[in-house]
Amino acid sequence: MDYKQSNLFLFPIGLGSTYIFYKKICGTFCSIDNDLEVNPYLTHGILMLTLVYFLSDYYLMIVKYNPKHNVYFVHHFIGIVSIYFSYMKYYYLIKYLFAYLTFELSTPFLNIAIKYRNQGVYNKCSIFSELAFFILFTVVRIIFGTYLWFVTSNTLSSIEYPYNYLIVLPTILQFLNYWWYYRILKILRAKLFGCINKED
């Protein structure tokens, strides 16, 4: 889907998940007994919006297949499976799902930055978009994401067999974040010291 449609989903998903995380998960993050229901309409609404986003984008990626986007099939599949298991089978894990959904705070700024780059526009808005994306990606997906990976992996490893193998989901997702971050750093280096490779 195009960047405008994508951002219509991602802004409320990222902001809503951050609000839920801040209000009810912060401070009791490692407790499986904490009450998640900040507002049931908000929590279920964010979950439904996220599921609709993943499924619709998955469908569009199939219809408009581009081999460069194969990694997003993995990303969206992890999201869909995580929603199912955390909502239908292990509801106490849903706090981790909302923590992971805070990752989407960075994506709208990436979409905007790509739009400006494709149009060959370089102005204050494009600079702000790139800077906001880099900072948010670093803080949310790399620093917080690494911590979240360890916490989630520890919790998932204690689930009964065979569902303890769900540990592969946050592991794959975090390594995707590291791979994307490597590419981001390459682009940043090219911006500062040379030309950008169109493949990045």
From Swiss-Prot:
One of its GO terms (cellular component) is membrane. It is found in: Membrane. SMART domains: TLC. It comes from the Viruses. Its main location: membrane. The keyword Membrane applies. The chain crosses the membrane at residues 9-29, 43-63, 74-94, 96-116, 131-151, 165-185. The keyword Transmembrane applies. It holds the Pfam family TRAM_LAG1_CLN8. Keywords: Membrane, Transmembrane, Transmembrane helix. Residues 1-193 form the TLC domain. It is a multi-pass membrane protein. GO terms for biological process: lipid homeostasis. InterPro entries: TLC-dom, TLCD. This is Putative TLC domain-containing protein L438.
